[in-house]
């Protein structure tokens, strides 16, 4: 099999990368109708598998789990999750031949093996669903022509897919039909019903392509969504400790600070996040952000280049063949970080304190979002896709860190995201330790900032540059469709 993206012509690549259309609410007026009469099987009961199944069942879809025979016989975790939640469970041989729609929500590394087992069992004219296009685009799997291939990709980990649904809202999603596999012209109808069943129609759905989803998703998760949060957590915690801050307090400040600060992004983008700072702190955060962008721009661009040309995927798949040697080494290294070992801090930290004492964290968030967004746009990815992958999903990832630090984030994101996160951190942490950390001022993190005079012209220009960035203009439009988005309360 050959990387699908690399087989396309230059013009075809641009067409696939740029495919993006925001779908109106009335396009989902039929709800789950297209799935009501269908037997839907989900393969895999991990974070995405379980939580998508719960949402779909609550929306009225008939869901069954198809699991490996060994998983059922040995009562492994996937079997336990499905049965504990009252779902019917069966083997591939028992479930797949009867299913109209088969949704493959196993890890990327398992897809080739899974498809080899289930494709001969799938009935003529059935549908195969994915929530990430890696297997189609990067591995280059060719699916039987009579099978319709669709994708609904929620823009967050599975845990947040469920939590946002239970709040009466949902998470944005990209949906797509693989144009090589839509013989009956039914793919989009089924994808819309699936997205509706997840609750994504309440948050915003983009009609996209498998290519655009994969390339933007890989870029977002490697850089701002996971990579910058992990690198920032390591750097900020170590800096606070080196300045005499209590380890328990520093641990809670970092662990919960990302969630508190990024919650402002959901309601008002970078502008609102920066407005939570004092005028002097806003100017300082802006200056730090610009320095970070100048230093990190080549790193972001190299990651995008390796995602587009397939180098990243090739290297990661080699690690799969080596029994995840690199991934497991990085995972163990992360578990031993001083931040992960820090004792719990029992006292409350007020919401505003995270902004007042977290100027560096705000700068890290701002720079990472803008760099990720700008790099994607330059590569041909549509602004709306880039927004979801760089800004909107960030608070949902930060929520996972607030639960159990970096361990929780890395457990609920995919192995693909986790691998890319570690790859990014290995470059960025030493780079910023040499360039940014030695030049921080008292008050940039963990301590009260100094009182300084504010120049009106500088403040005006700073506000203009924040508000006129393209991501802020795109964000205003996309957030206008999220009228029922639920806010988190911290104090």
Swiss-Prot record:
Residues 209-344, 345-485 form the KARI C-terminal knotted domain. Pfam families: KARI_C, KARI_N. The keyword Repeat applies. Binds 2 magnesium ions per subunit. Mg(2+) 1 binds at residues 217, 221. Mg(2+) 2 binds at residues 217, 389, 393. Pathway: Amino-acid biosynthesis; L-isoleucine biosynthesis; L-isoleucine from 2-oxobutanoate: step 2/4; Amino-acid biosynthesis; L-valine biosynthesis; L-valine from pyruvate: step 2/4. Its cofactor is Mg(2+). Residues 14-208 form the KARI N-terminal Rossmann domain. It comes from the Bacteria. GO terms for cellular component: cytosol. GO terms for biological process: isoleucine biosynthetic process; L-valine biosynthetic process. NADP(+) binds at residues 45-48, 68, 78, 158. The keyword NADP applies. Its EC number is 1.1.1.86. Substrate binds at residue 414. NCBIfam families: ilvC, PRK05225.1. This is Ketol-acid reductoisomerase (NADP(+)). The gene is ilvC.
């Amino acid at each position: 099999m050959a990387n699908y993206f690399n087989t396309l012509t230059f013009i075809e690549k641009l067409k696939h990368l740029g495919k993006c259309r925001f779908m109106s609410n009335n396009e989902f007026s039929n709800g789950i109708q297209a799935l009501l009469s269908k037997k839907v099987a989900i393969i895999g009961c991990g974070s995405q598998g379980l939580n998508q199944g719960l949402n779909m069942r609550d929306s009225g879809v008939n869901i069954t789990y198809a699991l490996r025979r060994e998983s059922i016989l040995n009562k492994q975790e996937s079997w336990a999750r499905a049965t504990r939640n009252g779902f019917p469970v069966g083997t591939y041989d028992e479930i797949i031949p009867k299913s109209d729609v088969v949704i493959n929500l196993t890890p990327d590394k398992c897809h080739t093996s899974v498809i080899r087992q289930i494709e001969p069992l799938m009935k003529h004219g059935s549908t195969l669903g994915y929530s990430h296009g890696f297997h189609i685009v990067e591995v280059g799997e060719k699916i039987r022509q009579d099978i319709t291939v669709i994708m609904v990709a929620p823009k967050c980990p599975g845990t947040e897919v469920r939590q946002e649904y239970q709040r009466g809202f949902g998470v944005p999603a990209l949906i797509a039909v693989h144009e090589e596999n839509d013989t009956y012209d039914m793919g989009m109808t089924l994808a819309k019903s699936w997205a509706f069943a997840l609750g994504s129609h309440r948050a915003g759905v983009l009609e996209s392509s498998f290519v655009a989803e994969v390339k933007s998703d890989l870029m977002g998760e490697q850089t701002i969504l996971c990579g910058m949060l992990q690198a920032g957590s390591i750097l900020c915690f170590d800096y606070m400790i080196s300045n005499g801050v209590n380890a328990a307090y520093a641990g809670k400040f970092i662990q919960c600070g990302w969630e508190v600060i990024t919650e402002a992004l959901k309601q008002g983008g970078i502008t609102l996040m920066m407005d939570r700072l004092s005028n002097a702190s806003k100017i300082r955060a802006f200056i730090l952000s610009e320095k970070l962008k100048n230093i990190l721009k080549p790193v972001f661009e190299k990651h995008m280049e390796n995602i587009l040309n397939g180098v990243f995927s090739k290297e990661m798949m080699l690690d799969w063949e080596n029994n995840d040697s690199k991934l497991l080494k990085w995972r163990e290294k992360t578990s031993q970080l001083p931040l992960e070992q820090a004792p719990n801090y029992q006292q409350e930290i007020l919401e505003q304190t995270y902004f007042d004492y977290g100027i560096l964290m705000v700068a890290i968030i701002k720079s990472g979002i803008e760099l990720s967004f700008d790099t994607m746009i330059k590569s041909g990815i549509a602004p709306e896709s880039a927004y979801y992958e760089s800004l909107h999903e960030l608070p949902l990832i930060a929520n996972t860190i607030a639960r159990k630090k970096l361990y929780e984030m890395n457990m609920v994101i995919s192995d693909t995201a986790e691998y890319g996160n570690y790859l990014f951190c290995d470059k960025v942490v030493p780079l910023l330790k040499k360039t940014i950390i030695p030049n921080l001022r008292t008050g940039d993190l963990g301590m009260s900032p100094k009182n300084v005079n504010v120049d009106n012209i500088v403040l005006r220009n700073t506000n203009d540059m924040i508000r006129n960035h393209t991501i802020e203009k795109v964000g205003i439009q996309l957030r206008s469709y999220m009228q029922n988005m639920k806010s988190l309360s911290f104090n």
